[in-house]
Amino acid sequence: MSVNGPIDASLLRIVRDRTGAPETAICRAYESDASFRAACADVRICFRAQRRWEAADSSRAPALAAEYAELLEDLAEELRRILKPEP
């Protein structure tokens, strides 16, 4: 285990579901790569915000939930790039 510690189960599930990457690859990257950890932190924040807007009773809620969904996909793509660097 590194000084940063392992990824928690809820974040692991979110990242796995968004990237399709194996849990072992996600755990390794989380423990060894600061940019991956930072992107994971952004994913967690974005995921929570999207869920809040999906549950919100506001005329703006659907548009904001959609914006967060799009941002979440962009972040997932960033995580996939980190997990599978170009040859």
Stretches found by the model and what they are:
Residues 1-87:
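Extended, charge-rich alpha-helical interface modules
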